[in-house]
Amino acid sequence: MTIKTIEGTLDARNSRFALVVSRFNDFIGQKLVEGAVDCIVRHGGSEEQIALYKCPGAFELPSVAKKVAVSGRYDAVITLGAIIRGATSHYDVIAAEATKGVAQVGLDTMIPVTFGVLTTDNLEQAIERAGTKAGNKGFDAALAAIEMVNLYQQV
């Protein structure tokens, strides 16, 4: 028995991407944006295929991502930001709602929506995941978006 395997390729040449980034913890967000843009360009895309939307914080990411997704102008939405644990339970609420909200946007709109939002215990961990020791999670989120766009085109 031969099973047909369908998977996405890593070709960004003919796709349009919206980056939706939280301005809270902006210097981390900017590093994630740089990683996402680098990924798209390395995989055949260009900066002309990318639009950058900035929102106040991680809680606003899902609503902006949905507005962008339903516009029909983009093949994928890449959400980026950093939620860093503080002394109160605010972190848990924002991290959970941002995660659930972004996931729901993908289900509601049926276009790829990826999650490049860091949820870390401290600033050092966020810096590590925004381009130092642990790679750049913005790059990773863009890579997933590229693959998902190409997979969706085959379904």
UniProtKB/Swiss-Prot annotation:
GO-annotated biological processes: riboflavin biosynthetic process
GO cellular component, one term: riboflavin synthase complex
Keyword check for Magnesium: no
Any coiled-coil regions, as ranges: none
Residues binding 5-amino-6-(D-ribitylamino)uracil, per UniProt: 24, 58-60, 82-84, 115
Gene3D superfamilies: Lumazine/riboflavin synthase
EC number(s) reported in the record: 2.5.1.78
Reactions the enzyme catalyzes: (2S)-2-hydroxy-3-oxobutyl phosphate + 5-amino-6-(D-ribitylamino)uracil = 6,7-dimethyl-8-(1-D-ribityl)lumazine + phosphate + 2 H2O + H(+)
One Pfam family in the UniProt entry: DMRL_synthase
Residues engaged in binding (2S)-2-hydroxy-3-oxobutyl phosphate: 87-88, 129
GO molecular function: 6,7-dimethyl-8-ribityllumazine synthase activity
Keyword field: Riboflavin biosynthesis, Transferase
Pathway it works in: Cofactor biosynthesis; riboflavin biosynthesis; riboflavin from 2-hydroxy-3-oxobutyl phosphate and 5-amino-6-(D-ribitylamino)uracil: step 1/2
Active site: 90 (proton donor)
Enzyme class: transferase
InterPro entries: LS, LS/RS, LS/RS_sf
Biological role: Catalyzes the formation of 6,7-dimethyl-8-ribityllumazine by condensation of 5-amino-6-(D-ribitylamino)uracil with 3,4-dihydroxy-2-butanone 4-phosphate. This is the penultimate step in the biosynthesis of riboflavin.
Record-linked HAMAP family: Lumazine_synth
Cited NCBIfam families: lumazine-synth (TIGR00114), PRK00061.1-4 (NF000812)
Family to which this protein belongs: Belongs to the DMRL synthase family.
Name of protein: 6,7-dimethyl-8-ribityllumazine synthase
Organism per entry: Prosthecochloris aestuarii (strain DSM 271 / SK 413)
Phylogenetic classification of the source organism: Bacteria, Pseudomonadati, Chlorobiota, Chlorobiia, Chlorobiales
